[in-house]
């Protein structure tokens, strides 16, 4: 893939400022030890998919608009009679962002989408998994500017997982704080 001349704002900030700040804070001997963003996974589970098979397709179209990349329709791995769910039924959509699209999505998430969330008090600082990854949930997908509120017939929630190369939660928390993640105090 040819290298494009465009470099996202957050990636440029990471290279110029954030890497140096993290290296000074944790005093790494090697530059490759400095944690960086690896990928962002966005998952949209559609609970009502058992009744209407078109709902995951509609959710996938909204997710494609938000992420700028075609999502994968996720299917049920096994049948659950209580949920009227059969193996192989479409139950949601997910997309994995890397590179330029990852930094662009992160920029929109931090600066546009999260401030538009109702009653937002900050991200939970305990949502790290112990290996340097951060998970969060958004209850309404209409907080993203790509979604036209008038054309939405149903609100979808989504899970957003930010995967980093950090080895522990403290390194990942420091990295995401440098990216201006609004953590709760």
Swiss-Prot record:
Part of the 50S ribosomal subunit; part of the 5S rRNA/L5/L18/L25 subcomplex. Contacts the 5S rRNA and the P site tRNA. Forms a bridge to the 30S subunit in the 70S ribosome. The keyword Ribosomal protein applies. Belongs to the universal ribosomal protein uL5 family. The lineage of its organism: Bacteria, Pseudomonadati, Pseudomonadota, Alphaproteobacteria, Hyphomicrobiales. This is one of the proteins that bind and probably mediate the attachment of the 5S RNA into the large ribosomal subunit, where it forms part of the central protuberance. In the 70S ribosome it contacts protein S13 of the 30S subunit (bridge B1b), connecting the 2 subunits; this bridge is implicated in subunit movement. Contacts the P site tRNA; the 5S rRNA and some of its associated proteins might help stabilize positioning of ribosome-bound tRNAs. Keywords: Ribonucleoprotein, Ribosomal protein, RNA-binding, rRNA-binding, tRNA-binding. The keyword Magnesium does not apply. This is Large ribosomal subunit protein uL5. InterPro entries: Ribosomal_uL5, Ribosomal_uL5_bac-type, Ribosomal_uL5_C, Ribosomal_uL5_CS, Ribosomal_uL5_dom_sf, Ribosomal_uL5_N. GO terms for molecular function: rRNA binding; structural constituent of ribosome; tRNA binding. One of its GO terms (biological process) is translation. PANTHER family: 60S RIBOSOMAL PROTEIN L11-RELATED (PTHR11994). Gene3D superfamilies: 3.30.1440.10. GO terms for cellular component: ribonucleoprotein complex; ribosome.
């Amino acid at each position: 893939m040819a290298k494009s001349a465009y470099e996202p704002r957050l990636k440029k900030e990471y290279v110029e400022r954030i890497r140096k700040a993290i290296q000074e804070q944790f005093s790494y001997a090697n530059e490759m030890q400095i944690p960086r963003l690896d990928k962002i996974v966005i998952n949209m589970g559609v609970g009502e998919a058992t009744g209407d098979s078109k709902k995951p397709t509609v959710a996938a179209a909204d997710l494609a608009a938000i992420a700028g990349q075609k999502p994968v329709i996720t299917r049920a791995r096994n049948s659950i009679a209580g949920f009227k769910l059969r193996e192989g039924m479409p139950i949601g959509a997910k997309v994995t962002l890397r590179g330029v699209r990852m930094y662009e999505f992160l920029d929109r998430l931090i600066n546009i989408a999260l401030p538009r969330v109702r009653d937002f008090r900050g991200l939970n600082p305990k949502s790290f998994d112990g290996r340097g990854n951060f998970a969060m949930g958004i209850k309404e997908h209409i907080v993203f500017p790509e979604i036209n509120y008038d054309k939405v017939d149903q609100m979808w929630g989504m899970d957003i997982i930010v995967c980093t190369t950090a080895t522990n939660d403290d390194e990942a928390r420091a990295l995401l704080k440098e990216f201006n993640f609004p953590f709760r105090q």
